[in-house]
Amino acid sequence: MLAPTLSYAATSCVWRSTNTPAPVYLVGTIHALSGKDYPLPKAYDQAIRDSKTVLFEQDPKPNPHYRALWERAAKYPNGEEIGRHLHAKTYKLMFAAIRQVSWDWNEIKYYRPWALAALGWGIRGYNDVRGSLGVDNHLEHLAKRFHKQMGGLESDAEHLEVMRGMPDIDAELMLVDSMVHGPKNKAQMEQVTAAWKRGDLGPPTAEVARSRQLNLGAEIRLLDYRNLRWAKRFEPRIKSGESIAVVAGSAHFVGPNNVRELLEKRGYKFEQL
């Protein structure tokens, strides 16, 4: 799908409220970047400096039990194997794909399809939230430096349930897309990242549309449901007059049922910086 040719006066994927007692920033990020993508546009620094509280997708406070929780969510119970949950064609495709990444079948046969996608190719905007060069990680360090209060939009359990509770058919589609289009998806994300750096919403919006057309069920779990829950969760802070920055993947601020539009429907107004 071609990205719409739109022009933007803005230079970042950051929005600031224009009709609230205290500033509210919506900070769209790319979870996985490289060192050459820095420094970031000034609006990212401004959003952290101007806010009393910075809310990330997950609480940045380390959870020593998170890996064990992930493993429990990622595997089928009672020793079930993935083969029982896949179409025969997908099963055959999977064996061809795992040979390319040199996996040991006995080590991965109990994982759910989405977990294999995450381990082998990555799930856009989900499993790389805490990437060392990601914007979220960078802004977390900035918030610590400025002594800001920090919190999470969802608990670790809620974050894991997004995937663990996904129906097999949606998880299988996610795995197939990762195996078949992995290299192409990487090239597309490079285009999305370049657009994100200059505040161009066209390619990020087109990428969300492509993903929804391919696997609507998964996208609704990854984006729509979480957007609705998050907006309801932090709106009381806005009403109380607290200055906040909401830091999340840029896909949460474009496309259907995005956080920004959910707030605009409730009367809040935002300008893109």
Regions found by a protein language model. Give the residues of each.
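N-terminal signal peptide c-region/cleavage motif recognized by signal peptidases
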Residues: 4-5
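A cross-kingdom marker for long, charged
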Residues: 216-273
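Structured, acidic catalytic/metal-binding patches in enzyme active sites
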Residues: 11-222
